[in-house]
């Protein structure tokens, strides 16, 4: 049995759910998490955790708040020396066999200072560590995203990138691609059939969502705004893991942002997606662009573009046919690679 310290960015559930899924695959080893925000919730599942500050992305009004994100990053970098000193003491006491980072800043730096092996497992490095044509109109957005990834989050020795799309890697000796890492809960469900569209648009306003969907012929099941009365064709539901997965597995399609976790789960169940990327969130835009390029759905750059939703819904059967028979489950292969690296 090995001891693994697993650093996780705690500003969104995507990082944490992927890390917990990987930890579940490595259950014969001792896993100790490190991070801030949502990471501390792992204690409820019986894991130990080390508290760390976050260099997270801050969202406001449905878009990345660049100035607030930069201010938070600068504040934590000014405290970096003290944070790293405390973390080194923790690692020296634990003496881990491996350090893993899912887009966490401090753990790979402390590992390097102590001469500990460190690997990265995330989706974000598909942005910087693979080769692809920049989507039209996104050069500045790509640059603004790539710089912090390279400067702040690329200190591991090796990168295991989880992704539903697979462009060529830039450095085959250090970078490997795997299929999506799925949470355990979706794997307990099987895909069904239905006519509704599941809607989860983090950061969008209720007004914008209702203006887009109200009065259309199709029925929409909407999460993220709490439970409400809804309209003739729109049902608003309260947050529920089981309820969400039930509605996902029986949906005809999904309308969501470009987050990799929900895209991967949707594709696992054969559900096409119409993507509305969060503003100035290049990783989400890139995901959505590949969704469209691969024929798995449509990229909808503005929530007001009703004509794109019209086209998407008309082509749901064709998009579903493109997804049929494909695998979007890379948990076992990625875990086997980690075992080989121990």
Predicted regions: what is each one?
Residues 129-204, 225-226:
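A nucleotide-sugar donor-handling region in carbohydrate enzymes
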Residues 150-161, 165-168, 296-342:
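Leloir-type glycosyltransferase catalytic cores
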Residues 267-315:
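Catalytic binding pocket for nucleotide-activated donors in carbohydrate/polymer assembly enzymes
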Residues 98-102, 120, 247-286:
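A donor-sugar binding/catalytic signature common to diverse glycosyltransferases
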Residues 6-10, 29-79:
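Conserved nucleotide-sugar phosphate-binding/catalytic loop shared by glycosyltransferases and other
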Residues 181-253:
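Donor-nucleotide binding loops and adjacent catalytic segments primarily
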Residues 6-20:
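A short, glycine/small-residue-rich beta-strand->loop->alpha-helix junction that serves as a flexible
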């Amino acid at each position: 049995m090995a001891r693994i310290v697993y650093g996780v960015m705690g500003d969104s559930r995507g990082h944490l759910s992927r890390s917990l899924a990987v930890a579940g695959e490595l259950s014969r080893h001792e896993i100790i998490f490190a991070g801030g925000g949502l990471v501390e919730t792992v204690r409820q599942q019986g894991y130990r955790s080390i508290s760390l500050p976050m260099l997270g992305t801050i969202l406001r009004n449905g878009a990345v708040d660049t100035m607030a994100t930069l201010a938070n990053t600068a504040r934590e970098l000014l405290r970096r020396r003290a944070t790293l000193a405390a973390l080194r003491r923790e690692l020296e006491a634990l003496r881990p066999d491996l350090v893993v980072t899912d887009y966490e800043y401090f753990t790979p730096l402390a590992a390097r200072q102590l001469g500990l092996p460190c690997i990265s497992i995330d989706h974000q490095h598909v942005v910087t560590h693979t080769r692809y044509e920049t989507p039209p109109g996104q050069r500045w957005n790509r640059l603004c995203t790539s710089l912090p990834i390279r400067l702040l989050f690329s200190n591991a020795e090796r990168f295991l990138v989880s992704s539903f799309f697979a462009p060529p890697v830039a450095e085959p000796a250090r970078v490997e691609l795997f299929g999506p890492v799925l949470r355990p809960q979706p794997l307990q469900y099987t895909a069904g059939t239905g006519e509704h569209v599941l809607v989860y648009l983090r950061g969008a306003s209720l007004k914008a969502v209702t203006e887009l969907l109200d009065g259309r012929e199709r029925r929409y099941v909407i999460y993220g705004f709490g439970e409400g009365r809804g309209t003739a064709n729109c049902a608003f539901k309260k947050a529920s893991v089981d309820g969400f997965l039930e509605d996902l597995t029986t949906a005809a399609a999904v309308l969501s942002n470009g987050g990799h976790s929900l895209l991967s789960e949707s594709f696992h169940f054969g559900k096409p997606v119409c993507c509305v990327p969060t503003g100035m969130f290049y990783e989400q835009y890139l995901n959505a662009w590949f969704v469209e390029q691969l024929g798995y759905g449509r990229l909808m750059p503005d929530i007001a573009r009703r004509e794109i939703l019209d086209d998407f819904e008309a082509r749901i059967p064709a998009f579903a046919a493109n997804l049929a028979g494909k695998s979007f489950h890379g948990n076992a292969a990625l875990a086997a690679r980690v075992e080989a690296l121990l």
